[in-house]
Amino acid sequence: MPKLMEAGLSAKGKTFALIASRFNDFITDRLVSGAVDALVRNGAADKDIHLVKVPGAFEIPLLAKKMAEKGEYDAIVCLGAVIRGSTPHFDYVCAEVSKGIAQVSLEFSVPVIFGIVTTDTIEQAIERAGTKAGNKGWNAAVSAVEMANLMEVVTRA
């Protein structure tokens, strides 16, 4: 039987950075609320949750890198909403943001969670920010807690 390494969902004593896009703030504000709620419900103190707002989703990876460089965060949660329009801009932004977030996580060995809602319509984005499809900010924050704890488990193993 293999040894299973698992981690709990306690955020107590951990520090989290939330990076949120101001663009489409009618969506991202709901994602931020969901993320903060998830962190607090899992034991994080308000003082240990740091929120930074950036102009748009494209700017998130750079700020994630800067926050990771500081070495003060157990996990970084990236929140934004990119909604498809009539030009290829959506594809460029989504591709670069997802690559950038993954790159920061790998470079600094810190969980950097992709909480960017990428949808075809405004309605789909609204659904993913707290209505029919749950709140992806909440989901991203829970992933951040689990990954922060799992990093500790694996480091100690």
Swiss-Prot record:
<keyword id="KW-0686">Riboflavin biosynthesis</keyword>
<dbReference type="GO" id="GO:0000906">
    <property type="term" value="F:6,7-dimethyl-8-ribityllumazine synthase activity"/>
</dbReference>
<dbReference type="InterPro" id="IPR036467">
    <property type="entry name" value="LS/RS_sf"/>
</dbReference>
<feature type="active site" description="Proton donor">
    <location>
        <position position="89"/>
    </location>
</feature>
<feature type="binding site">
    <location>
        <begin position="81"/>
        <end position="83"/>
    </location>
    <ligand>
        <name>5-amino-6-(D-ribitylamino)uracil</name>
    </ligand>
</feature>
<dbReference type="InterPro" id="IPR002180">
    <property type="entry name" value="LS/RS"/>
</dbReference>
<feature type="binding site">
    <location>
        <position position="23"/>
    </location>
    <ligand>
        <name>5-amino-6-(D-ribitylamino)uracil</name>
    </ligand>
</feature>
<dbReference type="InterPro" id="IPR034964">
    <property type="entry name" value="LS"/>
</dbReference>
<dbReference type="GO" id="GO:0005829">
    <property type="term" value="C:cytosol"/>
</dbReference>
<dbReference type="GO" id="GO:0009231">
    <property type="term" value="P:riboflavin biosynthetic process"/>
</dbReference>
<comment type="function">
    <text>Catalyzes the formation of 6,7-dimethyl-8-ribityllumazine by condensation of 5-amino-6-(D-ribitylamino)uracil with 3,4-dihydroxy-2-butanone 4-phosphate. This is the penultimate step in the biosynthesis of riboflavin.</text>
</comment>
<feature type="binding site">
    <location>
        <position position="114"/>
    </location>
    <ligand>
        <name>5-amino-6-(D-ribitylamino)uracil</name>
    </ligand>
</feature>
<comment type="similarity">
    <text>Belongs to the DMRL synthase family.</text>
</comment>
<protein>
    <recommendedName>
        <fullName>6,7-dimethyl-8-ribityllumazine synthase</fullName>
        <ecNumber>2.5.1.78</ecNumber>
    </recommendedName>
</protein>
<dbReference type="GO" id="GO:0009349">
    <property type="term" value="C:riboflavin synthase complex"/>
</dbReference>
<feature type="binding site">
    <location>
        <begin position="57"/>
        <end position="59"/>
    </location>
    <ligand>
        <name>5-amino-6-(D-ribitylamino)uracil</name>
    </ligand>
</feature>
<feature type="binding site">
    <location>
        <begin position="86"/>
        <end position="87"/>
    </location>
    <ligand>
        <name>(2S)-2-hydroxy-3-oxobutyl phosphate</name>
    </ligand>
</feature>
<feature type="binding site">
    <location>
        <position position="128"/>
    </location>
    <ligand>
        <name>(2S)-2-hydroxy-3-oxobutyl phosphate</name>
    </ligand>
</feature>
<comment type="pathway">
    <text>Cofactor biosynthesis; riboflavin biosynthesis; riboflavin from 2-hydroxy-3-oxobutyl phosphate and 5-amino-6-(D-ribitylamino)uracil: step 1/2.</text>
</comment>
<keyword id="KW-0808">Transferase</keyword>
<dbReference type="Pfam" id="PF00885">
    <property type="entry name" value="DMRL_synthase"/>
</dbReference>
